[in-house]
């Protein structure tokens, strides 16, 4: 699998952009705030319908314009796919595959798999539980079409339940309708908890090997899934918390409050680990994501690497670059020295200056 080309129109700081990409490594270099990350964001958005930064659609449309367009040409199993995405202010985004509009993000499943790796990902260990849930969900949504649909349904139900909890203060008669949302929330929540639990077991098999290699065998990494409540007790917990939820006007229990605990040699490194340990563990998790996707789809995902090398020491740079040698990779950076010193093969180089992309001679 690889991306053949990308076109942008009125996206972020790009008036218009057309790029043909190499199947191997594509480097985008330039000073900060020139638009390098915007290219990766556009590709990830087009392939998943989500911004890796959680940006709103209207914020990605170029200032002063009413709409934006992204086109991505993908080659997979000798088949070609054209993915078009239209963003319009105050309207839902439109996505089409080979000219046919799709209604759900899950219809992109099986067309392109993207792994985004940014400096923020290196803080996944020390940041709050929301970041670790996001890591889980981004991975599972690319691997399991049913999970993607179930998660969307669950989030919708929680949002509707929270809205109802707020409305109860002025319309107490609506209380009986909570039963409907509670039953549906428990149904979809159990599915999510079970899928997350299964995935963590598979993740541990991979992450232990990678982390062992990264640390020279000095550390054994273990990821522990910490559900807010078990699948078996979810419905009863929701029921038991109802009065509390009505006072707080929000849903206090469920998989939207799950967390992960990352242990190195039996020690919780979020609390007791050094920054170096936390970053190495985060790198192990992201590399595991790549290997699991490869194994599941029996193909290589496309890696979007946003200025991560500058955050790693030389040995971890080497390990990362060796790990991605057979994957189409788009890398942003401020210079080429790291790649030259590691004698890393580069297939195409692009210079980015204030929203203009060129290939140096």
What are these regions (language model features)?
Residues 47-125, 129-131, 140-143, 147, ...:
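Nucleotide-state sensing region of NTPase/ATPase domains
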Residues 306-308:
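Walker B catalytic acidic pair
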Residues 72, 328-335:
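Structural recognition of the conserved hydrophobic beta-strand(s) that form the central parallel beta-sheet
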């Amino acid at each position: 699998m690889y991306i053949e080309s990308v076109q942008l129109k009125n996206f972020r700081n790009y008036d218009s952009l057309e790029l043909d990409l190499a199947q191997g490594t594509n480097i985008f270099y330039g000073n900060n705030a020139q638009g390098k990350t915007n290219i990766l964001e556009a590709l990830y958005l087009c392939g998943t319908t989500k911004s890796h930064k959680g940006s709103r659609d209207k914020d990605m449309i170029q200032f002063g314009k009413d709409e934006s367009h992204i086109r991505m040409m993908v080659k997979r199993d000798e088949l070609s796919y054209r993915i078009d995405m239209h963003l319009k202010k105050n309207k839902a985004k439109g996505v089409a595959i080979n000219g046919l509009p799709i209604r759900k993000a899950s219809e992109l499943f099986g067309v392109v798999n993207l792994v985004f790796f940014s400096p923020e990902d290196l803080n996944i260990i020390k940041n709050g539980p929301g970041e670790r849930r996001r890591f889980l969900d981004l991975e599972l949504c690319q691997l399991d079409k049913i999970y993607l649909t179930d998660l969307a349904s669950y989030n919708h139900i929680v949002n509707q339940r929270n809205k109802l909890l707020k409305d109860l203060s002025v319309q107490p008669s609506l209380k009986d309708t909570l039963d409907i949302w509670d039953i549906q929330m428990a149904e979809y929540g159990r599915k999510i908890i079970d899928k997350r639990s299964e995935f963590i077991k598979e993740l541990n098999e991979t992450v232990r090997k990678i982390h062992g290699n990264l640390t020279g065998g000095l550390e054994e990494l273990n990821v522990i899934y910490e559900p807010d409540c078990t699948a078996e007790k979810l419905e009863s917990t929701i029921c038991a918390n109802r009065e509390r939820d009505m006072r707080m006007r929000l849903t206090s229990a469920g998989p939207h409050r799950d967390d992960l605990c990352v242990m190195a040699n039996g020690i919780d490194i979020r609390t007791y680990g050094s920054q170096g340990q936390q970053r190495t563990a985060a790198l192990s998790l992201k590399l595991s994501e790549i290997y699991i996707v490869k194994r599941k789809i029996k193909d290589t995902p496309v890696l979007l690497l946003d200025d991560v090398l500058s955050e790693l020491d030389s040995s971890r740079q080497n390990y990362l670059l060796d790990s991605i040698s057979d994957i189409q990779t788009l890398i942003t950076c401020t210079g080429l020295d790291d790649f030259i010193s590691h004698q890393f093969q580069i297939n195409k180089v692009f210079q980015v200056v204030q929203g203009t992309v060129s290939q140096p001679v």
